């Protein structure tokens, strides 16, 4: 999904050459129905390809936001044969996700995501129905719900303490060298994910298909990094489904090879843990819970465990890295947060119990979610039945995309949205409702299951990091705010100089 038009634009020439006899069919596929009385404004495009050529910069969320300034918060574009309604307003997006949920609840997946998710065999990609309800109930009961979070409290504390110890050691080894924040944070988040999902921090595993043991780094690459990159692969046939018979071997080879590696590694990890269970070594983890339920096929079991494994490995890292970048860039705001921590905690280390009493910390977290939306675009959905959004008629069969980046950069809803200003969220104690102002965790019945854990980890980590160290950007990094294509990942990993505060 991420490189929405690198591959799409690259395949346009091939598609155009092949569609000569299909122009009429394409026109019919995108023609608005006659009874559509008040459609959203349409962004002008070209025959056959629609607006694909205008999205070639690979950051469609930014292009969508620019179009919103011209056409308004809701408008229609065409991506090949598909008509897509784009929402760029918090108010309209919440109307779609909450009030009109029953009309707009079917996931629209690219061919790459269809393969990687084993045709929606995950909570995040499944349509609303029995499987989605079951999967969400399982992960909330055993891993991400309030009660389950209490069971993993010690593990969350451990990974934050590990990060702080690593920071102290790196500063001690070379006080003048900047450290790479992402490397340290990534390793500890993956440790947490493995303990929660598999019951232990796996250092290596034997994979039958590879004929050898693979390291933890290789496990991470096969289950997280490679999958994230493969998920953004675009098959030009997604835009021209009437040409699905045309081969695209290079795309298919990349996607199926990546999926096969992920499956081989996940099967090896699950096999290793099943052997542990046979030895009588039961543990509190997601895999043990799912096996005890005994309601899933082997494929469903593998996919749900994999989903749990990557749960904390992406958005929590993105948000925390951006928060520390902004605090290092803005020493006055960093000092305000530090003083708040001192007033509330004194010399005591910040804990999760302190979080409700740290309103400026909450403001830092919320403003980071707004300014640097971890998921700039919510994956497309189908409109199941004729409906109305923001006073416009939207017919069944239309695709809908919510541009969270555009919602949070909407000048009519946010003052000076390009500025990172935690003060816009400051005031009073932290409230659970604050988590949904930016819609970073979604809204309505499809709200992100991991929102509570993400908040616990990110807020506690940010507070401890500022409590222990003064943060300063590497010289020249003040304006490095570019992201990796569609994701919110910093294109340039955060390099910082740390100064121990001598608290402990």
From Swiss-Prot:
GO terms for molecular function: ent-kaurene oxidase activity; heme binding; iron ion binding; oxidoreductase activity, acting on paired donors, with incorporation or reduction of molecular oxygen, NAD(P)H as one donor, and incorporation of one atom of oxygen. The keyword Hydrolase does not apply. PROSITE patterns: CYTOCHROME_P450 (PS00086). It is a single-pass membrane protein. Its EC number is 1.14.13.-. Gene3D superfamilies: Cytochrome P450 (1.10.630.10). GO terms for cellular component: chloroplast outer membrane. It is found in: Membrane. Heme binds at residue 448. The keyword Acetylation does not apply. Expressed in leaf blades. Disulfide bonds: none annotated. The chain crosses the membrane at residues 3-23. Keywords: Heme, Iron, Membrane, Metal-binding, Monooxygenase, Oxidoreductase, Transmembrane, Transmembrane helix. Its cofactor is heme. It is an enzyme of class 1 (oxidoreductase). May hydroxylate diterpenes. Belongs to the cytochrome P450 family. This is Ent-kaurene oxidase-like 3. The lineage of its organism: Eukaryota, Viridiplantae, Streptophyta, Embryophyta, Tracheophyta. The gene is CYP701A19.
């Amino acid at each position: 999904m991420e490189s929405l038009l690198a591959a799409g634009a690259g395949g346009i020439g091939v598609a155009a050459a092949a569609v000569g006899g299909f122009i009429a069919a394409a026109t019919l596929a995108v023609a608005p129905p006659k009874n559509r009385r008040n459609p959203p404004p349409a962004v002008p495009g070209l025959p056959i390809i629609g607006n694909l050529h205008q999205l070639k910069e690979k950051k469609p969320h930014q292009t969508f936001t620019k179009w919103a300034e011209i056409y308004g918060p809701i408008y229609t574009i065409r991506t090949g044969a598909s008509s897509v309604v784009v929402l760029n307003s918090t108010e309209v997006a919440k109307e779609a996700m909450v009030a009109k949920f029953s009309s707009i609840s079917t996931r629209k997946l690219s061919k790459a995501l269809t393969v990687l998710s084993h045709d929606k065999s995950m909570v995040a990609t499944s349509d609303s129905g029995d499987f989605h309800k079951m999967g969400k109930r399982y992960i909330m009961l055993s891993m991400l719900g309030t009660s389950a979070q209490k069971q993993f409290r010690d593990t969350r504390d451990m990974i934050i303490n590990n990060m702080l110890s690593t920071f102290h050691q790196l500063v001690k080894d070379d006080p003048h060298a900047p450290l790479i924040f992402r490397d340290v944070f990534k390793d500890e988040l993956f440790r947490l994910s493995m303990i929660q999902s598999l019951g232990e921090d796996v250092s290596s595993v034997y994979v039958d298909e590879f004929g050898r043991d693979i390291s933890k780094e290789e496990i991470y690459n096969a289950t997280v990094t490679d999958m994230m990159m493969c998920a953004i692969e675009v098959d030009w046939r997604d835009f021209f489904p009437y040409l699905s018979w045309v081969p695209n071997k290079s795309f298919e080879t990349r996607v199926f090879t990546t999926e096969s590696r992920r499956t081989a590694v996940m099967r090896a990890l699950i096999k290793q843990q099943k052997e542990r269970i046979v030895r009588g070594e039961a543990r509190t983890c997601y895999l043990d819970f799912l096996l005890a339920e005994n309601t899933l096929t082997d494929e469903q079991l593998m996919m749900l465990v994999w989903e749990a494994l990557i749960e904390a490995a992406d958005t929590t890292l993105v948000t925390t890295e951006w928060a520390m970048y902004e605090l290092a860039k803005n020493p006055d705001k960093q000092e305000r947060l530090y003083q708040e921590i001192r007033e509330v905690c004194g010399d005591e280390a910040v804990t999760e119990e302190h979080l409700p009493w740290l309103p400026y910390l909450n403001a830092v977290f919320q403003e980071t979610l707004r300014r640097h939306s971890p998921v700039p675009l919510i994956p497309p959905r189908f409109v199941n039945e004729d409906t109305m959004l923001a006073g416009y008629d939207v017919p069944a069969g239309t695709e809908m995309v919510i541009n969270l980046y555009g919602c949070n950069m909407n000048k009519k809803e946010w003052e000076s949205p390009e500025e990172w200003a935690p003060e816009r969220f400051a005031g009073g104690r932290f409230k659970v409702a604050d988590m949904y102002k930016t819609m970073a965790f979604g809204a309505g019945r499809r709200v992100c299951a991991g929102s509570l854990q993400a908040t616990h980890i990110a807020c506690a980590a940010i507070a401890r990091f500022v409590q222990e160290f003064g943060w300063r950007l590497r010289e020249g990094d003040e304006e490095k705010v570019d992201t990796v294509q569609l994701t919110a990942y910093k294109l340039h990993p955060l390099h910082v100089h740390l100064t121990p505060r001598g608290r402990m």
